[in-house]
Structures are given as C-alpha cells and as structure tokens.
Amino acid sequence: MAEGVPRAGSALPAASLSSLPLAALNVRVRRRLSLFLNVRAPVAADWTVLAEAMDFEYLEIQQLEKYADPTSRLLDDWQRRPGASVGRLLELLAKLGRDDVLMELGPSIEEDCQKYILKQQQEASEKPLQVDSIDSSITRINDMAGITIRDDPLGQKPECFDAFICYCPSDIEFVHEMIRQLEQTNYRLKLCVSDRDVLPGTCVWSIASELIEKRCRRMVVVVSDEYLQSKECDFQTKFALSLSPGAHQKRLIPIKYKPMKKEFPSILRFITVCDYTNPCTQNWFWTRLAKALSMP
C-alpha cells in the first residue's frame, strides 16, 4: 500500500491486506460503502470516479449506472479482475480523498479480514481452530453505548434527539441562539449539539454516523463560509444525504444565518433553505424551523 494510506487496523499488516480478496468483505461493509459512494456529488469522488480508478471503461460504467446499487455491482465485477484486493481498494479510496470512508469503515474492514483469515486457517487444518487472541479481537463491544451525556452506559436506552446540529466552531454563537429559541421555549425540541452532548474519547466519524442515522430524526446544517472549509461538516452532510437521496424524507434542513462571500454549496441547492439573513422573513424563521423539526 502507498505511504499514508489509512489501514483497516494495526492488527493486520499491509501485506496481508494486499493479498486478501474482496470476498473477505461482508454484506454490511459493502452496504456502508454504497451509502458513501452511491451519492453523486461534485465535491466528492463517487462510485464512477472509483470505477475509473479501477480501469473500468466508459461503456462499462454506463452499464453499471442501470443498477439500483451501482457500488455493490462495481465491487462484484472488480473482484473478478486481477489485482483486486482489500488493500488495493483502501489505496484507491485514499488516492481519491475519501478519508471519511476509511475512518468510518476501518474497524469493520479489519474485523471482516480477521474473520476471513481465521476461516481460511480452519478450512486448511480441516478441524476447528481455537485462537483466543484472535477471537477476542473479533468480539466487538457496542462502542456506541454511552456516547452522549444522558446515554445509558449499557446501551439499553440510547438517548435520541429531534435534530443533529451540523456546525463549525466559529458558528457556535448562533447554535446557542438555536438552543434558546428551540429548546428553552414552548417548542421544547431536543437538539444534539456535539460540544454539549457528546462525550469525548470516541472516533468523531463513528459518533456522527451513529447519531445522524439512528439517534436523530433530522439534521440542521448551519451553512457559512467556515462550513465550506470543514471536513467534519462535509462528512456529516454527505452522510445525511446518503440516507435520504433526493431529500425525499426531508431529513436535512440547511440554514443560512449570515451573509456569505463564497458560493452556497451546490450539494444543498436542491433543498429549501431557512434564510435568517432575509429581514422580510426573519419573523417567521424560528416558527418554520421548529415546525419542520417537529414533523414525524
């Protein structure tokens, strides 16, 4: 693997990853890859860019576009070609700048690879193989239990929210205003604000994915010039869009609260914006936003 390529984990050397076939990756990992790569966006490399890096020709990519899950089909076709491996896939994702995918799926990929190696060893020996050190590394504890202030540490009753707030540190004052207007009024909404509600010590990508997908009914994006420079906000926005392609579930709500020098992000242009900068509609702003967040 090339220098700087994030590996699935230190337990497996790069040479092992390079020799492991894609068959080592299970359905769950493949589905998560599809969530990241099926979204067509000009600001991030999608499955078509990955296909080109895998040396698929234009006509082949056109054929893949006919499938509901082109990423899954791409991986199926590529794994039959020479040189396809888990390590090569990670290397290509790194070259395409998809560090968000590598950070989020790294632990799951390592787990799949360990299981695959263990299974191969068992089949080769033709008898059950008990390796405590490997078994213990495969057994995963629910590391998403106890990630927020009011979470049940045992994971029996995870804390849920009306909306996840995607914001930059420089926009924290407006987030405080959101808390005052939406939580401390008759609306009584429950917002997930990372700096206030999330406990330290866990991967930021994993926490964001868990909260956006499973714990929050909506996501509010505080758009600003600083937002456009944030990799964390970029990941959160693309992940939320991947859960609701075309905004059919009205899951994501962009907010423009101050004038911008830079162009509004194209990935959000097709979604209705709550514009706090328009003095003609400012009196209706909080009512509209609260109503949108209260919808089932």
Curated annotation (Swiss-Prot):
GO molecular function annotations of the record: TIR domain binding; Toll-like receptor binding
Residue numbers carrying Phosphoserine: 244
Stored InterPro entries: DEATH-like_dom_sf (IPR011029), Death_dom (IPR000488), MyD88_Death (IPR034249), Myelin_different_resp_MyD88 (IPR017281), TIR_dom (IPR000157), Toll_tir_struct_dom_sf (IPR035897)
Domain TIR, chain residue ranges per copy: 159-293
PTM info: Ubiquitinated; undergoes 'Lys-63'-linked polyubiquitination. OTUD4 specifically hydrolyzes 'Lys-63'-linked polyubiquitinated MYD88. Deubiquitinated by USP3 that cleaves 'Lys-63'-linked ubiquitin chains leading to inhibition of MYD88-induced NF-kappa-B signaling.
GO biological process, one term: toll-like receptor 8 signaling pathway
Domain Death: residue ranges: 32-109
Keywords: Cytoplasm, Immunity, Inflammatory response, Innate immunity, Nucleus, Phosphoprotein, Ubl conjugation
Cellular location(s): Cytoplasm; Nucleus
Cellular-component GO terms for this entry: cytoplasm; nucleus; plasma membrane
Main location: cytoplasm
Region spans: Intermediate domain: 110-155
Subunit organization: Homodimer. Also forms heterodimers with TIRAP. Binds to TLR2, TLR4, TLR5, IRAK1, IRAK2 and IRAK4 via their respective TIR domains. Interacts with IL18R1. Interacts with BMX, IL1RL1, IKBKE and IRF7. Interacts with LRRFIP1 and LRRFIP2; this interaction positively regulates Toll-like receptor (TLR) signaling in response to agonist. Interacts with FLII. LRRFIP1 and LRRFIP2 compete with FLII for MYD88-binding. Interacts with IRF1. Upon IL1B treatment, forms a complex with PELI1, IRAK1, IRAK4 and TRAF6; this complex recruits MAP3K7/TAK1, TAB1 and TAB2 to mediate NF-kappa-B activation.
UniProt remark on domains: The intermediate domain (ID) is required for the phosphorylation and activation of IRAK.
Function: Adapter protein involved in the Toll-like receptor and IL-1 receptor signaling pathway in the innate immune response. Acts via IRAK1, IRAK2 and TRAF6, leading to NF-kappa-B activation, cytokine secretion and the inflammatory response. Increases IL-8 transcription. Involved in IL-18-mediated signaling pathway. Activates IRF1 resulting in its rapid migration into the nucleus to mediate an efficient induction of IFN-beta, NOS2/INOS, and IL12A genes. Upon TLR8 activation by GU-rich single-stranded RNA (GU-rich RNA) derived from viruses, induces IL1B release through NLRP3 inflammasome activation.
Designated name of the protein: Myeloid differentiation primary response protein MyD88
Species this protein is from: Bos taurus (Bovine)
Lineage: Eukaryota, Metazoa, Chordata, Craniata, Vertebrata
The gene coding this protein: MYD88
